[in-house]
C-alpha cells in the first residue's frame, strides 16, 4: 500500500511538472526571406557604424538556443512562401503555391487552429498584405496562393482574435466586400495605430491596417513616415488584444514580410532596415518574456532565404558603412526618377546626379570612378531616352535606379545570387519554456510540431 501511494504521488508530481513546463504564451516570429546571411549582414553593418570589425548583436540572435532548418518544398528544392508557410504552420510539406493543404490537396489544420481549439487566443500579423502567403498559411486552405478573395473569406471565418498588416489585395469580388464580411463576423476595423489604441479595449476581435490617408501597403522601414504602421506597433497592439480578459494564454504569429520584398529587389540597405525593424518588434516579446519567464516561449525563424545575399564580393574587407548613405528604397528612387521623366522638359545629367546623391549618397559621400559614372550615365540614357526597366516579384524599377543600387551594394562589399528565393538554410532562435527542444539540424516541418508539443495544444 505504501508503495502504491508513493507511485501515485510520483505520477501526480510528474503530471504537475509536465503541465508546469507547458508554454502558455507563444510568440512565433517568421522573417520572410531572412536567411542566415540576412541576420549576419545586419549585424556586420551595425558594427561598421561603430567603426569596428565584427558584429553588433541583434537581440534575437543572442537567444540561448539556436540552430538551422531546411526549407525545401515537396516538389521543389527551392520553395515559395506558400509551401514554406504551410510547412511552418501545419507541419506538412506541400507543393509550391499551395496553402494549408498537403501535396495531394487535402486540407490540414495549422498550429494557430490547434491553439484556438485548445482555448488560446490567436493573433496573426505581418507588415505586408494580410492575405499574403505566409499569414494565410495559418488560416486558409487553397490550392493556389493567388485566390486572394477566398483566402480573405477564410480569414474572416477563422475566428482568430487579432489580425494586422496591409489591407486585402482583392477586397471586393463579385460584389462581396471582405471588409463587410469581417465586420459581420465580429471584427472591428482599426485604420492606423491611433485608431487601434482607441478601439482595442472594446473590440471583441480586431483587424488593424494602414490609416485611410496613407497608401494601402505599409512602406519599407527606410521609406516610412510617422503616419505608417511599424512592426512594434503591430506587436504591441497584438499583445494588448491577446492578453485582454485572457487566463488561458495565446499563440501569436508575427511575420516580417517586407524583408523578403527587399531581398527580391536585391536592395541591401532596405533589407537591413527591415531586419532591424523586425528585431525591434521582437524586443517587445522579450520584455513580455521577462515578465512571464516560466510561461513564455519565443521562436524566431524564417520560411526561406531570398536573394542569396553574401557579405563579400572578392576583396577580404567590407565597406558596409557606405550603405548608411542610402535614404530610401530603390522603389522610392524609381518613383523619383519617374516623376522627373513625366516632366516633359529634358532633365540634365546633373539633375539625375542630384537624385542619386540624395538617395544613395553617390558622387558626394560615396566617391565614384570615371568608369563607374560612365556606367550610370549609360543607364540614364537607356532609362530616359528609352524605357529600360528591371522587374522583380514585387516591383518594376528604373534600370538607372537598379544600376545605382547595384553599384552601392558592390562598393559596400555585398553580392547577390539572384532576385529570387534560394534553398539556403534558415535560422531558428529560441528562448523560454522548452527552448532547448529545438536542436540539431531541423526540417521546417519539425518547428510547428515541437512548438505545439511544448504548448500542449490539442490537434
Regions found by a protein language model. Name each.
Residues 15-20:
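Sec/Tat signal peptide C-region and signal peptidase I cleavage site
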Amino acid at each position: 500500500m505504501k508503495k502504491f501511494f508513493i507511485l501515485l504521488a510520483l505520477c501526480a508530481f510528474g503530471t504537475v511538472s509536465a503541465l508546469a513546463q507547458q508554454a502558455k504564451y507563444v510568440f512565433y516570429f517568421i522573417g520572410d526571406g531572412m536567411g542566415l546571411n540576412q541576420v549576419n549582414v545586419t549585424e556586420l553593418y551595425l558594427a561598421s557604424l561603430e567603426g569596428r570589425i565584427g558584429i553588433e548583436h541583434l537581440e534575437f540572435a543572442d537567444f540561448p538556443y539556436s540552430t538551422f532548418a531546411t526549407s525545401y518544398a515537396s516538389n521543389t528544392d527551392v520553395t515559395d512562401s506558400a509551401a514554406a508557410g504551410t510547412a511552418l504552420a501545419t507541419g506538412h510539406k506541400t507543393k509550391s503555391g499551395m496553402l494549408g493543404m498537403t501535396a495531394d490537396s487535402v486540407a490540414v489544420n495549422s498550429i494557430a487552429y490547434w491553439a484556438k481549439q485548445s482555448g488560446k487566443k490567436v493573433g496573426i500579423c505581418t507588415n505586408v498584405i494580410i492575405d499574403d502567403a505566409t499569414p494565410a498559411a495559418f488560416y486558409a486552405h487553397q490550392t493556389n496562393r493567388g485566390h486572394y478573395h477566398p483566402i480573405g473569406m477564410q480569414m474572416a471565418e477563422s475566428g482568430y482574435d487579432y489580425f494586422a498588416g496591409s489591407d486585402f489585395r482583392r477586397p471586393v469580388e463579385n460584389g462581396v466586400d471582405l471588409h463587410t464580411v469581417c465586420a459581420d463576423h465580429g471584427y472591428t476595423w482599426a485604420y492606423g495605430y491611433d485608431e487601434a489604441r482607441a478601439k482595442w479595449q472594446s473590440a471583441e476581435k480586431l483587424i488593424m491596417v494602414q490609416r485611410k490617408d496613407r497608401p494601402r501597403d505599409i512602406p519599407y522601414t527606410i521609406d516610412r513616415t510617422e503616419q505608417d504602421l511599424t512592426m512594434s506597433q503591430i506587436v504591441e497592439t497584438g499583445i494588448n488584444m491577446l492578453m485582454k480578459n485572457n487566463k488561458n494564454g495565446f499563440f501569436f504569429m508575427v511575420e516580417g514580410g517586407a524583408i523578403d520584398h527587399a531581398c527580391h529587389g536585391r536592395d541591401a540597405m532596405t533589407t537591413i532596415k527591415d531586419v532591424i525593424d523586425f528585431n525591434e518588434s521582437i524586443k517587445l516579446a522579450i520584455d513580455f518574456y521577462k515578465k512571464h519567464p516560466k510561461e513564455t516561449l519565443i521562436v524566431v525563424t524564417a520560411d526561406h532565404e531570398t536573394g542569396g545575399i553574401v557579405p563579400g564580393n572578392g576583396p577580404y574587407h567590407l565597406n558596409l558603412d557606405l550603405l548608411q548613405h542610402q535614404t530610401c528604397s530603390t522603389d522610392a528612387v524609381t518613383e523619383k526618377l519617374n516623376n522627373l521623366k513625366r516632366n516633359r522638359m529634358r532633365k540634365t545629367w546633373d539633375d539625375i546626379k542630384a537624385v542619386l546623391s540624395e538617395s544613395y549618397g553617390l558622387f558626394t559621400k560615396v566617391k565614384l570612378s570615371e568608369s563607374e559614372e560612365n556606367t550610370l550615365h549609360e543607364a540614364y540614357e537607356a532609362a530616359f531616352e528609352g524605357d529600360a526597366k528591371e522587374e522583380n516579384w514585387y516591383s518594376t524599377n528604373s534600370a538607372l535606379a537598379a544600376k545605382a543600387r547595384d553599384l552601392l551594394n558592390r562598393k559596400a562589399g555585398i553580392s547577390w545570387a539572384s532576385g529570387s528565393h534560394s534553398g539556403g538554410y534558415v535560422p531558428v532562435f529560441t528562448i523560454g519554456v522548452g527552448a532547448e527542444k529545438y536542436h540539431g539540424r531541423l526540417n521546417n516541418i519539425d518547428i510547428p510540431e515541437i512548438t505545439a508539443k511544448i504548448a500542449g495544444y490539442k490537434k
